[in-house]
Amino acid sequence: MTDALKLDWAVTVPPTVEPIDILELRSTTTGSYLRVDFTDDDLVLTALIKSCRTIAEQICSLAFAPQTIQAIWTMPQVNAGSLSGFKLLYDQDFYQYNESLGANPFSPAPFVLQLPQPPLTAVTLFEYRITAFNAWQTWPATVGSPPVANYVVDTLPSPGLVYLQYPPPAYQYRLTYTCGYATLPPDLKLALLQFIAWKYENRVGEDMPAEIQSQFMGNKVWVL
């Protein structure tokens, strides 16, 4: 396997609740972070919360709040319709590994997809299409009776993983999934508060302070 799948993704349902409440910023509230004792800048603060959260998510490759993402994996042009673009869990020829699966149906799945922007909550839809001109088809989580898993979702790792026993040969695979922290970890929340406060007090487009950037980079997740 020399070529990798091309990954494109987008947020289809953005967070409905931000990880930072505006009341946590105003000095009219006990324990607030910013020294702002008026409500005139509420619109500015609301916009900054969203903007800073989005920037921090891009730096960390994390979802700071619950959201829905749609990701598409495209096979390399020379391998379209084959399985050679998948990341193999084992350094073996696929056909040899497929033979081993026949001998032991409980073997680990040989293929894995890494889902960007953890933490992963759930995969709601797995689709594929043979060519760009074909309609998307649903790939069910299980097949047969008794049911046998086509794929297994693991939400514990970061990034989240989808293991596939034998994915359908196709040009593209599309997954829709939910992800994001229900409650932002304290270190990320503090870094986000500091970022918002800095942006509020420095509105001329200066570079992010190294101290704040290092806090985000210390939590960055790498998708291979």
Segment roles from a protein language model:
Residues 1-224:
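Divalent metal-cofactor coordination and adjacent catalytic microenvironments
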